Amino acid sequence: MASTLRLSTSALRSSTLAGKPVVQSVAFNGLRCYSTGKTKSLKETFADKLPGELEKVKKLRKEHGNKVIGELTLDQAYGGARGVKCLVWEGSVLDSEEGIRFRGLTIPECQKLLPKAPGGEEPLPEGLFWLLLTGEVPSEQQVRDLSAEWAARSDLPKFIEELIDRCPSTLHPMAQFSLAVTALEHESAFAKAYAKGINKKEYWHYTFEDSMDLIAKLPTIAAKIYRNVFKDGKVAPIQKDKDYSYNLANQLGFADNKDFVELMRLYLTIHSDHEGGNVSAHTTHLVGSALSSPMLSLAAGLNGLAGPLHGLANQEVLNWLTEMKKVVGNDLSDQSIKDYLWSTLNAGRVVPGYGHAVLRKTDPRYTSQREFALRKLPDDPMFKLVSQVYKIAPGVLTEHGKTKNPYPNVDAHSGVLLQYYGLTEANYYTVLFGVSRALGVLPQLIIDRAFGAPIERPKSFSTEAYAKLVGAKL
């Protein structure tokens, strides 16, 4: 029988903090793999690249630090700072026409280049995490080692389990998720080291360890919340020889369906990062800039993600589609859908899942999910309805004339896929989004600490002060 990895979190942390190579053997997804000095770990890879990255930033600021990179209008100040260039975010850049690139790679390129599970079609999110932190596409061995390391760090403290168990089932899953992540502050290596006094150059080491521990524990936390609120409260243990997405699917209770496991791999990858200006990413960065631990920083980001304008859109899409079917009935003709779209707009409501603050074309994250559905569930009635709306809505929204982007975003599709595979509890979906988003925001937090990023402190003005600034009388 293949051996499985059995390495305590404390032993793993002490070994990695000390810079010692961790030798481990694990049968990963049926393939035996070994992590030794021959294969660079994620931490070693990042540490090797760090001096060169620091030098690039130093040179850029020295030679061009006084260059103007943009202008700010009064409308932007009042309009949520849309389009204001003022954040540094290494992992991804969003182009309004092309969509997201992760370290320069499009989603189709990531699907092609990032390692997959044996027999799988979708990239493993472990590979994307590696890419976001280092800028390099990892080898299959490196991804398997990272999966094994997260599995080794996954055990939850007893008090976290008890904390979740004590939450009333009526408490929103996102509130429970944020609560549990906040409570993991008790385990923070960074907080403990900072309290004792450490050199600033060591900040990133402890931030890395906290981030790895935190990510490793998120599937069990998320699954425990789901099983407590919607099922029997029983959660399967992490399987040390399986990848991150498989374990999440298994703990939720859906691993018997290989296609659902593949969906989780795709979902966790494409929802992870979308530049640094969105609420969850910016909040995590902002709170982290005060040297709060990764636990407190991510919890703050999760609270932002829980807002209706950020992470609840896929739930609203499902509600809107369900309402349409009730109103329209069996006559789901193009004209009836067009009429329903107009009734939504004329009632002063938005069409959920359409439009984006930055994008001006169809979201490639939507496209990747659509392609998945075309392969796996082409005859599903809800998928057919989503496809029909996709054909009709852009024209209606363009004619309506009040949106800069009449095309679908990522939220227009994800809920329908989850529903198809039996995960029907829509108010839980944002928790899955939160697990994924951690994979995008925590690499930047590690980078922030490694670069010595300062506390964020923009300038604010009152309306009267702005009026004076622009020469207006109120």
Swiss-Prot record:
Keywords: Mitochondrion, Transferase, Transit peptide, Tricarboxylic acid cycle. Citrate synthase is found in nearly all cells capable of oxidative metabolism. Its EC number is 2.3.3.16. GO terms for cellular component: mitochondrial matrix; mitochondrion. It is found in: Mitochondrion matrix. GO terms for molecular function: citrate (Si)-synthase activity. PANTHER family: CITRATE SYNTHASE, CITRATE SYNTHASE, MITOCHONDRIAL. CDD domains: ScCit1-2_like. This is Citrate synthase, mitochondrial. It is an enzyme of class 2 (transferase). Belongs to the citrate synthase family. GO terms for biological process: carbohydrate metabolic process; citrate metabolic process; tricarboxylic acid cycle. Pfam families: Citrate_synt. Residues 1-35 form a transit peptide. Gene3D superfamilies: Citrate Synthase, domain 1, Cytochrome P450-Terp, domain 2. It catalyses: oxaloacetate + acetyl-CoA + H2O = citrate + CoA + H(+). The active site is at residues 310, 356, 411. The keyword Transferase applies. Pathway: Carbohydrate metabolism; tricarboxylic acid cycle; isocitrate from oxaloacetate: step 1/2.
